[in-house]
Amino acid sequence: MTTRIDAFRTETTAIDGLHVIRMKQIHDERGTIREFFRASAMTDAGLHPGPWRQLNLTETSHGAVRGLHGEAMTKLVSVVQGSVFGAYVDARPNSPTVGAVVTVEIEVGTQVLVPQGVCNGFQSTSDGVSQYLYCFDEEWRPGMSGVGITPLDPRLAIKWPIPIDAANRGQLSQKDLDAPTLASVLASLGN
């Protein structure tokens, strides 16, 4: 039996505190084992190890967009089925990378650690449904502080891989369409 091991590794990005994580994976003739989370590996890499207090799983159809949302919680996000185009925007007014945009192709085996205040959004690129898993270090509650930014903000210049029809509620929610631009969010925060 031939075994191949892909080691746990992390990549820094243009947003302070946003990291792309490649899971440890063990492949053989039977299939693959993915080490979804190991606190000691996160700590050894200098990353936030949780604890995770809430897990959400979304099922999202081909071409649909969710986000951009930035709450007062750190998120570890991943795909457990399918693939997505992830988009991240630093909306933290005191961040050294405020306004930076990072995009990541996320497939099974890839995670993104999203610091609190960084907006997270994605578009499903799978032919079928993508399952996107969120791990939160705080429980979401109504009235929780945070911001939303429209994924169609032209100044962000996000190149969504599947064209977005702003009139199609099956592709983009009214709430996300009506969200403010990053410039409006930063102005409201006094920046």
Where are the regions that the model predicts?
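Conserved metal-binding segment of the jelly-roll/cupin
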Residues: 105-127
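Non-catalytic, conserved peripheral segments adjacent to functional cores
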Residues: 1-106, 127-130, 136-144, 148-191
